[in-house]
């Protein structure tokens, strides 16, 4: 439920029991995160987890600070958990600001060169865009224009990108078709 994948078969059972466990958790880290997410006293749903809890946990990983989430989930001390959880909320806000900044730059690029969105796939790049969020940005560009999108961050002589596709266009096949131009792919 923290990623965009089809939920079926036994995975539905895992999610159901997982949500019940989160709602009734005695883990200080989850309790603090639930409180800081405004979910205290509420039944934790897949929507709550997807849009409030997971982004806070993932934000620090995207910013290169994943040990914070690990510490939050492992601590036995509620005061420490509350402090870490508060920091995760700050870090999530920072991640959102980084995303907004890049999206504004992309909007500016497209306004200056509207032909970028006329191709079958949108490929857009910028200098030193945060690599931890370019996948999220690619998803937003794809949603905005209804086309596959690749967002690339250029760091000196190296460029790293992330793409998102629409149904019916296997983006990974397109990437593999140009693998001779790439140093790495995944």
Descriptions of predicted regions:
Residues 1-185:
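Hydrophobic helix-and-loop "lid/oligomerization" segment in the mid-to-C-terminal part
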């Amino acid at each position: 439920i923290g990623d965009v994948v089809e939920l079926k078969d036994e995975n539905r059972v895992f999610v159901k029991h997982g949500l019940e466990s989160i709602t009734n958790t005695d883990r200080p880290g989850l309790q603090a995160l639930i409180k800081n997410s405004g979910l205290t006293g509420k039944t934790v749903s897949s929507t709550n987890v997807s849009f409030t809890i997971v982004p806070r946990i993932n934000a620090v990983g995207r910013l290169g600070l994943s040990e914070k989430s690990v510490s939050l989930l492992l601590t036995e001390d509620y005061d420490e958990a509350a402090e870490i959880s508060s920091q995760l909320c700050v870090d999530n806000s920072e991640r959102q600001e980084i995303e907004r900044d890049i999206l504004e730059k992309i909007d500016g690029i497209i306004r200056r060169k509207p032909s970028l969105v006329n191709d079958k796939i949108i490929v857009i790049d910028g200098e030193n865009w945060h690599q931890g969020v370019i996948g999220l940005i690619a998803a937003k560009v794809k949603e905005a224009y209804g086309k596959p999108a690749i967002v690339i961050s250029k760091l000196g002589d190296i460029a790293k990108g992330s793409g998102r596709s629409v149904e019916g266009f296997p983006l990974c096949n397109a990437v593999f078709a140009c693998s001779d131009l790439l140093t790495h792919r995944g």
